[in-house]
A protein has these predicted regions:
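PLP-dependent amino-acid enzyme catalytic core
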Residues: 1-330
Length: 330
């Protein structure tokens, strides 16, 4: 049986609209957490600007991914829910989809890299999902995931390249700007591009003139290269501590949005990410995973130029095990 996908997938010309994000927000109300926005005088002084941190590390399943996963699964028919869902993910979408499926009375099968953090695998299993592993350096996860879904008749929910997922992710930026008012810039981690795409649609509607700035690890600069060249570029599997951003190529739909709405993508080193994680822990009293700290790292490293006056930063997740956190901080 061929894999099914949620209906009305949209087109690259009109992937997600502000109305789609409003609809997603209504679906997520009372289900997803309205995560806090953190301010710190210490951080403002270090950066030289007014910084507003949207703390998605406090989201259900530990990251922003729950927003998109729940929005997508909530749109499935009863028959699709009964058959179950599938996904490929390095960890955060895996946990999010497993939880969303459980909440909506469905089941989930997740394709994860063999070297995914143990904490992310354990959490995914804890939400009731089945895990199938693959070698991320020698296998194409999209192809393997599609075959897995086809063999089992499951609905495949991709981690970023679907309009319902993108719209769900955009609700985080919507909440942020509702709380802060207009911002001069929004700095967002970039993996496959779903978070910044949804954020850009929401933010440019609510705060006209806002600068959308993406952040990638130095080893995983596929979106930066793609935006510079005007077409999607594929790179070797990135080797970086930011496992949630170890993506080879931007999504087709996410790239269509981001090439239109994102001003620039800046890069940060693994050491700069570690430094941001340490500062978040020691001074802000929050735990972030490497990918979750990359946008903060860009500000602390002075990578965002010219420096805006009022800046929003998405702390995208906090799914890191204690042993791994201590190893990174050593």
């Amino acid at each position: 049986m061929p894999p099914t996908t949620p209906t009305d997938p949209g087109t690259p010309a009109d992937v997600v609209t502000p109305a789609d994000i409003e609809d997603a927000a209504a679906r997520l109300k009372g289900v997803a957490h309205r995560t806090p926005v953190l301010r710190s005088r210490t951080l403002d002084a270090l950066v030289g600007a007014e910084v507003h941190l949207k703390c998605e590390n406090f989201q259900r399943a530990g990251a922003f991914k729950f927003r998109g996963a729940y929005n997508a699964v909530s749109r499935l028919s009863r028959a699709e829910l009964a058959r179950g869902v599938a996904a490929f993910s390095s960890g955060n979408h895996a946990q999010a989809l497993a939880l969303a499926a459980r909440e909506l009375g469905s089941s989930a099968v997740i394709l994860m890299p063999e070297d995914s953090p143990r904490s992310k695998k354990d959490a995914t299993l804890g939400y009731g999902a089945e895990i199938v592993t693959y070698d991320r350096y020698n296998g194409d996860r999209a192809d393997i995931g599609a075959r897995l879904a086809a063999e089992r008749g499951l609905t495949l929910i991709p981690p970023y390249d679907h309009p319902h997922v993108i719209a769900g992710q955009g609700t985080a930026a919507r909440e942020l700007i509702e709380e802060t008012g207009p911002l001069d810039a929004l700095v967002v981690p970039v993996g496959g591009g779903g978070l910044i795409a949804g954020s850009a649609v929401a933010a440019t509607a609510l705060s006209p003139g806002i600068r959308m700035i993406g952040v990638e690890p130095e080893a995983g600069d596929d979106t930066r290269r793609s935006l510079a060249g005007g077409e999607r570029v594929r790179i070797p599997v990135p080797r970086t501590i930011a496992d949630g951003q170890a993506v080879e190529q931007p999504g087709e739909l996410t790239f269509a949005v981001n090439r239109r709405l994102v001003e620039s993508v800046v890069l940060v080193s693994d050491d700069e990410i570690r430094a941001a994680m340490r500062l978040a822990f020691e001074r802000l009293k929050i735990v972030t995973e490497p990918s979750g700290a990359s946008a903060l790292a860009a500000l602390l490293a002075g990578a965002v130029e010219p420096l805006p006056r009022r800046i929003g930063v998405v702390v995208s997740g906090g799914n890191v095990g204690l042993d791994r956190f201590l190893e990174l901080m050593a």
